[in-house]
Amino acid sequence: MSTTTLTRREQRAKAQHFIDTLEGTAFPNSKRIYVTGSQHDIRVPMREIQLSPTLIGGSKDNPQFEENEAVPVYDTSGPYGDPEVAINVQQGLAKLRQPWIDARNDSEELDDRSSAYTRERLADDGLDDLRFTGLLTPKRAKAGKRVTQLHYARQGIVTPEMEFIAIRENMGRERIRSEVLRHQHPGMNFGARLPENITPEFVRDEVAAGRAIIPANINHPESEPMIIGRNFLVKVNANIGNSAVTSSIEEEVEKLVWSTRWGADTVMDLSTGRYIHETREWILRNSPVPIGTVPIYQALEKVNGIAEDLTWEAFRDTLLEQAEQGVDYFTIHAGVLLRYVPMTAKRLTGIVSRGGSIMAKWCLSHHKENFLFEHFREICEICAAYDVSLSLGDGLRPGSIQDANDEAQFSELHTLGELTKIAWEYDVQVMIEGPGHVPMHMIQRNMTEELESCHEAPFYTLGPLTTDIAPGYDHFTSGIGAAMIGWFGCAMLCYVTPKEHLGLPNKEDVKQGLITYKIAAHAADLAKGHPGAQIRDNAMSKARFEFRWEDQFNLALDPFTARAYHDETLPQESGKVAHFCSMCGPKFCSMKISQEVRDYAAAQAIEVGMADMSENFRAKGGEIYLKREEA
């Protein structure tokens, strides 16, 4: 843990330097590859980890080696992971999906922004220095049209996004020839459908059934298509965002890039401070992954932070503002109903969701039903016009172990299931948010309740944290629950950083949270038996047994930390070819002893085989040539 504390000015300057010097960067001994689809502009990025050969024999002067296959892995870093791409944050990323969106001919550019707030911001010359310069002209569905991936899937259409995803989800595993690498234990998938090969048609069918979503706003053409669903790889979300007391636009863009480098499949911008609109524009124009928001946060800012003053009109304007900027999914707390709020009175920690508490306060102060629930169909109409997915928020999630799985939590979940069906009427894609704080033995019920109540819509959970006693280590306490619920069928895990319950995460906290959750997601994929999930583990184990230290570092989720820990005790280059590590030393290394046992067993087998042949030779009378009938 770093003890260096930077001033606000120093933090901003450091972030600005990061942005100014940003360039495409590969991980150690990795290279960016692209797998092309049926049309030339479907180019799916992957990272290929290059491995060194295995010494199999020969002499000191003439060693014999066997090549090890490169290992392809899923890559969320977009252009930031390609050294061949010139990065310019001021200009934003290339608009990868724009030709696909235009070719469908079901959307049109707007003459003006639909949001009054956006028009006010654009007219304010005082914001020119903060504003992203290359603003997109927003698009919206033509009259009578729907532009959602769910709509296309229901029409039987395989979109370029779906083909892109099918290639991406297969992770290049068809390239692997080694039986050692391809070996995989059968998993326990709790009813998930995990085909050996994911096809574009399978992607289409899962989206059409509502079991998966493709967050892909038509105004975010820079994003690389990805999918969230329990029959696909478990995904991880990272939260970023400024607050009234800390962080700047530069720092949030830096966190975005940093998040994609360390494996964030989506990023949520939870900004609540100044310049929310401008910060979000910079993030969207530079994001290769889907961006989610909680619109009620910004709507609250527009009424000076007074929950009672919120109105449907202010919220609707915020939805239009964010949809036309390109936000890919909205968290909407429409399930916090007036009649559920009293259920939380006997809780130890009450309502811990920020959005949930805002809506509960509004309901109580007006003694009216939640206006998000009352206007839900209008929300769906807006989402259908831009292809904004809905993430139905768990505003009544438990904030402590004591409150887990209570009446309030599951009452809201059942309402979210009802809202899911309404959203599907409008061809709007839906996922369901989940807890929270839940002890291990109570986690599986959350998954089974969600599947039943919400009609198998994808589940997206914050952890859950499995104990409340570890502030500063809640990435661990929640990572345990995340791995379990991912195994049971949760489609996406929202990361928790070491700063959870303590403060706003910095860049290093973001990395720690992401690494923890990538471990949890991968462990869940292994447990489910997701095809190809074990390839990287097998490659690591083989490298470990063969003392290929450089390959072990490079196959790690965090190669830099793995190398640093090794080099703390064996920094010399000779330590990277040694057949031992500092934990056991040369005489007690279990791997080295195992190799010696294997070599001894092989030699013994040869010796026993020779003895058997000798005995057989003597039994035949010691004749060099045998008669035909004796042979």
Curated annotation (Swiss-Prot):
Question: Where, in this chain's numbering, is substrate bound?
Answer: 239, 268, 297, 333, 353-355, 394-397, 433, 460
* Keywords, in A-Z order: 4Fe-4S, Iron, Iron-sulfur, Lyase, Metal-binding, S-adenosyl-L-methionine, Thiamine biosynthesis, Zinc
Function noted in UniProt:
Catalyzes the synthesis of the hydroxymethylpyrimidine phosphate (HMP-P) moiety of thiamine from aminoimidazole ribotide (AIR) in a radical S-adenosyl-L-methionine (SAM)-dependent reaction.
Q: Which InterPro entries match?
A: ThiC, ThiC-associated_dom, ThiC/Bza_core_dom, ThiC/BzaA/B
Describe, as the record does, how this protein assembles with itself and its partners: Homodimer.
Catalysed reactions, semicolon-separated: 5-amino-1-(5-phospho-beta-D-ribosyl)imidazole + S-adenosyl-L-methionine = 4-amino-2-methyl-5-(phosphooxymethyl)pyrimidine + CO + 5'-deoxyadenosine + formate + L-methionine + 3 H(+)
Q: What is this protein called?
A: Phosphomethylpyrimidine synthase
Q: What is its EC number?
A: 4.1.99.17
Kindly report, in one word, the top-level EC class recorded for this enzyme.
lyase
Query: Any one cellular component term from GO for this entry?
Result: cytosol
Q: Which organism is it from?
A: Salmonella paratyphi B (strain ATCC BAA-1250 / SPB7)
**Which cofactor does this sequence's record say it needs?**
[4Fe-4S] cluster
GO-annotated molecular function: 4 iron, 4 sulfur cluster binding; carbon-carbon lyase activity; zinc ion binding
What's this protein's family per the entry? Belongs to the ThiC family.
Q: Which gene encodes it?
A: thiC
Binding positions (Zn(2+)): 437, 501
Would you kindly state one Gene Ontology biological process term found in this protein's UniProt entry?
A: thiamine diphosphate biosynthetic process
